[in-house]
């Protein structure tokens, strides 16, 4: 289900809601520290969704490369597992070229899974499992479900706070 890893290279992150100045700050940091941007926005990966996502314009980039933008058609799927794999590849490449990876975006699950070491696989849960676990959560409470997670996947449990019911589920 999840695999954890240890970050060994520096990565900056600029996170927050849409249209709050993340792009401008990310570009300024990239200019100052020799970095490139990795978009952590679940919608900017798609071509043609420029307005609703406040997608960076060519002028706003100031020539700083922006990765993970306009890669897919809107009818293609892209999961957190896909993002962490792509961001990991980009981080390795940028670091090898002496560039500072700067994660910029507002998709919290993308940011958390990448920065805090939980890598999700693309495996689909068996039919009905999520509903079964949600019922168990309602019946037994979050502590019991977290204890079950510790038994099934100790690495994932170590990377997830016991009170984060969404991630525990």
Question: Which functions belong to the PLM regions below?
Answer:
Residues 1-169:
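Phosphate/pyrophosphate-binding catalytic cores of soluble transferases and nucleic-acid-acting enzymes
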